[in-house]
Amino acid sequence: MLNIFSLICLNSDLYSSRFFLAKLPEAYAFLNPIVDVMPVIPLFFLLLAFVWQAAVSFR
């Protein structure tokens, strides 16, 4: 069981490091600023939930 878990963690670590080191093709280089901001977008939804609840007085 431990070997399977370590294998899964190792594989996900390899994929994530490859993901962050990947570059866009030259044809899409102008989209680099947008792609840099995209991982932060889910945090905006989390903040929006708190703002929304504050607007309705945390019912």
UniProtKB/Swiss-Prot annotation:
- Answer whether the UniProt record assigns the keyword Chloroplast to this protein: yes
Q: Which GO terms describe its cellular component?
A: chloroplast thylakoid membrane; photosystem II reaction center
Checking InterPro entries in the record gives: PSII_PsbK (IPR003687), PSII_PsbK_sf (IPR037270)
Question: How does the protein's chain sit in the membrane according to the entry?
Answer: Single-pass membrane protein
Q: Which GO terms describe its biological process?
A: photosynthesis
Annotated signal peptide:
none
User: Where found in the cell?
Assistant: Plastid, Chloroplast thylakoid membrane
Instruction: Give the propeptide positions.
Output: 1-22
> In which broad location class does this protein mainly occur, judging by the first location in its UniProt entry?
plastid
Do you know which NCBIfam families this protein is assigned to?
A: PRK02553.1 (NF002715)
Task: Report the sequence similarity comment from the record.
Answer: Belongs to the PsbK family.
UniProt protein name: Photosystem II reaction center protein K
Organism of derivation: Oenothera elata subsp. hookeri (Hooker's evening primrose)
What gene makes this protein? psbK
